[in-house]
A protein has these predicted regions:
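Hydrophobic alpha-helical segments, chiefly the membrane-spanning helices
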Residues: 230-231
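Well-ordered alpha-helical scaffold segments within catalytic/enzyme domains
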Residues: 19-34, 84-100, 157-168, 202-213
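Aromatic- and glycine-enriched pocket-lining scaffold segments that form the walls
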Residues: 89-95, 103-198
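Carbohydrate-binding/catalytic loop surfaces
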Residues: 1-13, 59-81, 129-148, 179-195, ...
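Domain-scale activation on soluble regions of proteins
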Residues: 33-39, 70, 148, 158
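Conserved small/polar residues in nucleotide/adenosyl-binding loops
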Residues: 219-226
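Long, well-ordered hydrophobic secondary-structure segments characteristic of membrane-embedded
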Residues: 9-59, 79-90
């Protein structure tokens, strides 16, 4: 929802956008808008393009020119966007695995995805002293940004989960994320930095939530408050 939406075309895209585009292809197939052969072919074309993109220690840069495929200045690696992209790669990998008999080279693309995931080193975005992820890495300045994701209710939650699962960062990072509770209109949940649906709900595109869990609790809180705002 945007209150002051501006319609215009920009010749750039981000790592999150690239990953979401892949997931959109899968969603289009699941909803019957596209056939499996066209969907697999489109995903293969997108993966081919990703392999051509310049990267930093396996990470996609935050923004690319869609015509030249060159990274846009200033060159920056976003922790959130990298987490999103790798998360969506796992979805694409699973989708191709389920349909790996349709094309002879599907296994080759699964191998490419595995390599992309493996080469994305999240440890370089992690601050060991605080046990938190930095906002990102300024490649031009060759340093981590001195701001950190310290809340569990954050759009960086997926990046944290994936980095731990890849063993790029220690499990104790998860317990370092703040879990301060709040209550509004009968709903309880965790606080985020700015209370946006983006912070609470973006990771839920991929991450499963279980009934009675803290994740479901703060998801309901955010959904209720968003509904109240729009009424």
């Amino acid at each position: 929802y945007q209150e002051n939406r501006k319609n215009k075309v920009v010749n750039r895209t981000s790592s999150t956008n690239i990953g979401l585009a892949m997931v959109a292809v899968i969603s289009a197939y699941d909803m019957g808008f596209e056939n499996i052969y066209a969907s697999v072919k489109l995903l293969q074309n997108m993966i081919d393009t990703v392999t051509k993109l310049e990267k930093w220690n396996g990470h996609l840069y935050n923004w690319y020119d869609i015509k030249t495929l060159a990274p846009l200045e200033p060159r920056y690696v976003s922790t959130v966007d990298s987490g999103n992209f790798v998360g969506y790669l796992y979805v694409v990998k699973q989708f191709l695995t389920e349909h790996n008999r349709l094309y002879e080279n599907v296994e080759d693309y699964i191998a490419i995805i595995n390599k992309l995931i493996e080469q994305t080193d999240f440890s370089l975005l992690y601050d060991n002293s605080s046990r938190l992820f930095s906002i990102g890495f300024d490649v031009n300045e060759n340093k981590l940004t001195d701001s950190y994701y310290d809340l569990l209710a954050s759009e960086a939650r997926q990046a944290s989960f994936i980095a731990i699962s890849k063993k790029d960062v220690p499990v104790k990072h998860w317990s370092s994320l703040n879990r301060t509770l709040t209550a509004m209109n009968g709903y309880k949940g965790l606080i985020s930095w700015s209370g946006t649906a983006f912070e609470y709900l973006m990771p839920n595109i991929n991450m499963k939530s279980y009934h009675g869990s803290l994740s479901v609790s703060y998801t309901h809180l955010r959904a209720h408050e968003t509904d109240q705002y729009l009424v």
